Structures are given as C-alpha cells and as structure tokens.
From Swiss-Prot:
Species annotation: Mycolicibacterium gilvum (strain PYR-GCK)
Protein name: Pantothenate kinase
Family: Belongs to the prokaryotic pantothenate kinase family.
First-tier enzyme category under EC: transferase
Predominant cellular place of this UniProt entry's protein: cytoplasm
Annotated InterPro entries: P-loop_NTPase, PanK, PRK/URK
EC number: 2.7.1.33
Length: 312
C-alpha cells in the first residue's frame, strides 16, 4: 500500500495490494449471476469480483459488526434495552459517481456479495432516481433542463426515507422511477422492510450542506471514479447501445433517438454530455469524492486499478 509523504487521512492501494486483503473470503457468485448484474458497457468479470469486491465485502462485513457493537455500547451508556439481534440498526452504504461510470453495477455486485454473509442476509438496494421530482413538478419549477442536478431531487423526502429505515421502522417506502418513461411511476413504491444493510446509489448521495444531509447517515460510502474523458466515451458508447435497445421501444421517452444514424447519435450524446452530465459531474459530483470511505479508480477499459481508503 502507498502512503503519501505528507500526513493524510487516506491510504492508497494498487490492485495487487488490495486483493491480498481478501484473506479467505469465499467467492459465492457465479458467472451467470454476474452477467445479470453487469450494466450496459460494463466489463466486470469474476476475477475483478475476487480481487476488488471480495476484499471490499470483507471490510464492510467487519465494519457492520463493529458498528453494531458501537450501537450496543451507546445503548448501555443510555441505560436503554439492548437491540434485538434479529432487528439490528440497518447499516447504510452510499454509492456515488458520475452518469455512465458504473456505480449501478458496483451497487448491485455489492448487494449480491453482502447478502451471502449469514450475519446480514437482508440487503436492499435503492436508487435515488426515485426521489427525482416528477416531470410535471420539474416543469412547474422550470427545472427540466437541470434534471439530475441536486435541486431536481426531493431531498427532504430522501432524508425522511433513510431516517425511517435507519430508525428501525417496520416499513419504509421509496418512489419508483422508470427509465423507459423518464419519469416517476405514479402510485408505485419500493417497499423496504427492516434490512440488515441498505445500499443507496445515486449521483449526489455524498453531498453536504448546512443542514443534516443523507450522507450524514451513511456508515460507509463508495465513490466510483475515472478520468472525465473516459466517462464521456463510456456515455457515448452506452447511448449508441441504448439506441438499438431500450430506445427502440415505442414506449420509450427517447424513442426518437432510435432512428438516428451513428454520426447523429454520437452528436446527440456528446451534446447531452457537455450540456448536462459533464457540468453536473464537475460542479456537484466530483467535489464530493473526498468524503467517500473508499474510492474505486477505473482505467479506460473499465477495470478498477487503484483504490483509496479513508482511514481517519
């Protein structure tokens, strides 16, 4: 592991150093399962799961146990009853990063691996897309052109949801977003029932502010990182694949893109990237990277080659 010459709260690893921390953690994920978890354009394989994600799952597993011991100590100090071992305080993980960087795949792989530990089998994954304001509300607020930026989210609703989960409520409900419709699905909810671990994945989950923010409730956080130029290329490549896939569905909000030529599609994707996604990354998402417990740094081929762990 690399230690910076100046005092630092971080410790950096190359992949070989990190994989040694897997110890004897077994791989319980099959190739078929990984295919279903892999996002569009992602190239994660079982070797990367073994060398990157298993050590990460082991670290989180250890931190879950330590966090529960801390809660028990606090309860003892307050003279409160010890928590029910069958209903521990949920451990909340935030996963952040740019559009097209692969954070959704990271979140899904983590969910699959963590759920295989017998001490925390109930692992739920929620994306913050469901907390975007509906298109009608965004239009009313004149924010459609800012969709995905922090102000386009119901941040109070998101905070209430995570607080409800973390406080041990029997049920918490999250709105559901449809990428096909490009809007919130009216009346549809994702039901969360006292999980052992909650993974919250989204662009802006690590944001801070003058008031309590959802990031203040995280027990662990991951930022998926890459060069901006690489993410742009991945976004354009994904756009071209979606033009032939999801966009081809007549019900898709983006169906009009399905008839574009390659040249037209690349132009459209690059325009969206530079007018929306790149500014959001630079202004809002990238500045939150130092807050992450762990930064996963990707190379141009999508492989994770370096990691930075916050130790303080």
């Amino acid at each position: 592991m690399a230690r910076l010459s100046e005092p630092s709260p971080y410790v950096e690893f190359d992949r070989a150093q990190w994989r040694a921390l897997r110890m004897s953690t077994p791989l319980k994920l099959t190739e078929d399962e990984l295919v279903r978890l892999r996002g569009i354009g992602e190239k994660i394989d079982l070797l990367e799961v073994e060398e990157v994600y298993l050590p990460l799952a082991r670290l989180i597993h250890l931190q879950v146990a330590a966090r529960q011991a801390l809660f028990a100590t606090t309860a003892d100090f307050l003279g409160e009853p010890q928590q029910n071992p069958d209903r521990p305080v949920p451990f909340v993980i935030g996963v952040a990063g740019s559009v097209a960087v692969g954070k959704s795949t990271t979140a899904r792989v983590l969910q699959a691996l963590l759920a295989r530990w017998e001490h925390h089998p109930r692992v739920d994954l929620v994306t913050t897309d469901g907390f975007l304001y509906s298109n009608s509300e965004l239009s009313r607020r004149n924010l459609m052109h800012r969709k995905g930026f922090p102000e386009s989210y119901d941040r109070r609703g998101l905070m209430r949801f995570v607080t409800t989960v973390k406080s041990g409520s029997d049920v918490a409900c999250a709105p559901v977003y449809s990428h096909l419709l490009y809007d919130i699905v009216p009346g549809e909810k994702q039901i969360i029932e006292h999980p052992d671990i909650l993974i919250l994945e989204g662009l802006n989950v690590l944001q801070t502010g003058p008031a309590l923010m959802v990031s203040d409730l995280f027990d662990f956080s991951v930022y998926v990182d890459a060069r901006i130029e690489d993410i742009e290329n991945w976004y354009i490549s994904r756009f071209l694949k979606m033009r032939e896939g999801a966009f081809a569905d007549p019900a898709s909000h983006f169906h009009h893109y399905s008839t574009l030529t390659d040249e037209q599609a690349v132009f459209a994707a690059r325009d969206i990237w530079h007018s929306i996604n790149r500014p959001n990354l630079i202004e809002n998402i990238l500045p939150t990277r130092p807050r992450a417990t762990l930064v996963l740094r990707k190379d141009s081929d999508h492989s994770i080659n370096r990691l930075r762990l916050r130790k303080l």
